[in-house]
């Protein structure tokens, strides 16, 4: 297993699953707030609260999905069947969520809440097994980095395809009828996402076998929570997605009201996405050269500095804004695949500590905190815009609203990146030397007794 080299076809196949997820995820992150406030016509404050409350359901659905996936037995494996058979209902609900039925004001609020909640549930059904799949395709740390690098290059391409093409599709399909355009645009993208998920199913294979679970769901949840490195990566995941969600969700408002033209949005977003593609491709060579944890925290520190600097860019300095967003795009997507590899490492760490490989529930918990970050980001945008007096129908916005939009686009992400750098530097201990020692022991069948798991100390010599 350790020496198995993954084929390019399988890496592409796995990456297609991430591309499909990002077609929907990035679209929701960038457009759904705008769609609800400016197209469907519901208040920004309500949308923010709805985003946050929907996560309460995820607190139940995500771990349940992970536990269910861990206990799945089929001829296709544990995780792959969920990817294929969840894809069609996922795509259908995406279209419903972006539809604008003729309803009363209260009817619109109920419709938005129901369809958005269904969308998050079906995202869970597809994406938790997909995330866990990366941990069972191979247990080779180098191959995992390569797999995740391919995944995030294709994920970035999928997100770029979705977000850059969305407005042209809206205009082509709907013309002046933006409601029809959004519905038709997401329908086209949902079909593409389904085909990608099917390709992922047929080209990947689960190789890392875990013994059948003999413990209860409650015990599995307890063991995951006791994994201190999983908790650290969970916090890093919230901060990472909060940064990108707030910046992404504010981008349409930023180009419209700060840069002065909504027409700049596609070019601005494309510049960011091109940077993302380059960043994804750089992750593997950089982590071959330097410990991935060091790359992670140094990059986050640099992102914090750049984000603060962007706050002071004059409103009429368009070229400077494009340069900043390109560099930020490169650096942000450089750390994202590293973070997912770190999550896979925490699964191995948990197995090394207590002999239990809890891949599904581990990634379920990660997806929950990821969606929590998404919800917090959406809620923060909605609440801050509402607090600043944002008026979607106005021709100009007041100075408080403009300052809030700039802060959402720059300072809020800066805080997230700074916290990520500090936490990774101080608390994440699964660095390359220790990982090599740990994986060698796992390969030999060495397991630490469960009673030692609470402390699970790491020798100082392996932390550096």
What are the language-model segments listed below?
Residues 1-464:
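Membrane-embedded alpha-helical bundles of multi-pass transporters/translocases
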């Amino acid at each position: 297993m350790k020496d198995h080299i993954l084929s390019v076809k399988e890496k592409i196949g796995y990456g297609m699953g991430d591309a499909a997820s990002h077609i929907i995820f990035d679209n929701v992150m960038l457009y759904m707030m705008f769609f609800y406030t400016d197209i469907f016509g519901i208040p920004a404050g309500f949308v923010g609260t709805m985003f946050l409350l929907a996560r309460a359901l995820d607190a139940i659905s995500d771990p349940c999905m992970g536990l269910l996936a861990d206990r799945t037995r089929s001829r296709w494996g544990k995780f792959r069947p969920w990817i294929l058979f969840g894809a069609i209902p996922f795509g259908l609900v995406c279209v419903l969520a972006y539809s604008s039925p003729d309803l009363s004001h209260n009817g619109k609020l109920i419709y938005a809440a129901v369809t958005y909640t269904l969308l998050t549930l079906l995202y869970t059904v597809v994406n938790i097994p997909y995330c866990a799949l990366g941990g069972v395709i191979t247990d080779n740390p180098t191959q995992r980095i390569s797999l995740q690098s391919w995944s995030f290059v294709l994920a970035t391409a999928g997100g770029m395809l979705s977000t850059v093409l969305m407005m042209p599709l809206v205009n082509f399909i709907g013309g002046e009828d933006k409601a029809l355009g959004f519905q038709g645009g997401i329908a086209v993208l949902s079909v593409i996402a389904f085909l990608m998920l099917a390709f992922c199913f047929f080209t990947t294979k689960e190789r890392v076998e875990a013994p059948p679970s003999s413990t209860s769901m409650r015990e599995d949840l307890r063991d995951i929570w006791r994994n201190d490195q999983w908790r650290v990566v969970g916090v890093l995941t919230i901060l990472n997605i909060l940064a990108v969600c707030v910046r992404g969700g504010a981008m349409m408002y930023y180009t419209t009201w700060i840069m002065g033209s909504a027409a700049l949005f596609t070019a601005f977003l494309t510049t960011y996405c091109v940077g993302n593609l380059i960043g994804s491709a750089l992750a593997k060579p950089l982590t071959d050269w330097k410990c991935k944890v060091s790359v992670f925290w140094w990059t986050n520190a640099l992102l914090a500095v750049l984000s603060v600097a962007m706050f002071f860019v004059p409103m009429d300095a368009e070229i400077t804004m494009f340069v900043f967003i390109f560099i930020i795009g490169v650096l942000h997507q450089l750390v994202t695949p590293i973070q997912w590899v770190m999550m896979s490492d925490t699964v191995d760490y948990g197995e090394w500590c207590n002999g239990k490989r809890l891949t599904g529930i581990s990634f379920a918990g990660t997806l929950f905190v990821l969606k929590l970050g998404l919800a917090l980001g959406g809620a923060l945008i909605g609440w801050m815009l509402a607090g600043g007096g944002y008026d979607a129908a106005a021709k100009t916005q007041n100075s408080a609203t403009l300052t809030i939009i700039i802060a959402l686009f720059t300072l809020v992400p800066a805080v997230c990146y700074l916290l990520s750098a500090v936490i990774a530097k101080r608390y994440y201990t699964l660095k390359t030397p220790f990982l090599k020692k740990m994986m060698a022991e796992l390969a030999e069948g060495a397991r630490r007794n469960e009673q030692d798991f609470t402390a699970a100390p790491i020798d100082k010599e392996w932390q550096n």
